[in-house]
């Protein structure tokens, strides 16, 4: 009877594959995260923009309370298993493309404003690329943003995302970005003329459901 447990364990271990996989699968298989964007996920109203930032990051068009906005969106972020590429696909409704100012991936838990790690505005005119409400792109390590200064804000803030929350090292690779996604601390944020500081709508990224 004493041999039963060791034998069972040995059989279980023997059943596991000990063979390495084809390395090419790293570029063709993916870890997928998704977000449904809505104004309700923004942590504040435009009227609550801090006074010190109203000139640089305040609205330049009349704002609407979150519960009255019609903007909605869905975004997918796919990481190749070898973490050399990531792919973003976004679809939005209820937003005038001409009103779009910025679109980012930030890091931060739900209800918290966090620094920018991917600035989609650096990759083309957002009003044009989102004109039909759909947009997709490929990301590499080179697309990760290290923002040292924003006009009107203290020099050095914000500086990308931490490789680990509460840790000083910054995110510089897709591997670090995927690690943050796994923890549920990445979010899409769309900024418009009417909703600039907090944003028009936001979507926290979580592992995609089958």
Where do the model's predicted regions map?
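Fungal secretory targeting signals
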Residues: 1-17
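N-terminal leader/targeting pre-sequences
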Residues: 18-210
